[in-house]
Amino acid sequence: MTIMNGQIYEERRHVDSVKDCNFYHTTDIPGVGLVEGQWDLRDGVDEYLGSYDFGSKRVLEIGPATGFLTFYMEKTASEVVAVELPMDRSFWNSVPYEKLGLARRNNDQWTDVEVQFFDHIGRIRNGFWLCHEKFSSRAKVYNGSSENLPDALGKFDVALLSAVLLHTRSPVSIMESCARLVSGTIIITEMFYPELGEDAVCSLVPAAGNDAWDTWWRFTPRFFTQFLEVLGFSEHQVTFHQQRAFNHTHDMFTIVSSRP
């Protein structure tokens, strides 16, 4: 948990230029203009968020990237708190590929993969803080493990986990951690793979024949709804939609699960 001088949230940072940034989301930034990112959610953001009404809600967001959804929700929400991993590789969820040098101890020399990832994520964080300033955002950022969220963050009406659980070693631990702090609703958006069927499936992506070091899982919607019911979120709305990323259209699903 990151607490300095009694302060649980990261201090705001000034970023001089878009040249210091990478952008995960295509965003029209006030005073800057349109910047292109890997994902363009502008035409489908309501579907992506399950058409949920964030009005006057306190929102917990896991993994904001460059903040497109953060600042969109903030238009109507009472507060948005985003959770990011510290820039410390002991927190990272890299798949431990032996052939990529990732199956190692924390004190080993950094691999080329890690160095490139560290630089990319640092520039993504710069993109978030540049947008934060340009949008005059009040959103707060907590740096720590989403598998062990502290009570000091307080209670939330809703949590958003969008296209993040596929990158995590233990998605159920993160869902459980969020559920402890959420009184109302959990929203999960992920890629849709109809070939996985309709049962509760969490399919492992990494294999010896690929280099998927940053992606662990593919899911069915039922995997999430079944475990969310275990956590007390038994009322579900599941929708399917398409979004643009990496110059392609992708099938996705969004689950809006609420406590009764």
Question: What name fits each language-model region?
Answer:
Residues 66-77:
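Conserved SAM-binding loop of SAM-dependent methyltransferases across substrates and taxa
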Residues 35-57:
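Conserved alpha-helix/loop element of class I SAM-dependent methyltransferases that forms part
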Residues 157-170:
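A short SAM/SAH-binding and catalytic strip from SAM-dependent methyltransferases
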Residues 57-65, 187-211:
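Conserved class I S-adenosyl-L-methionine
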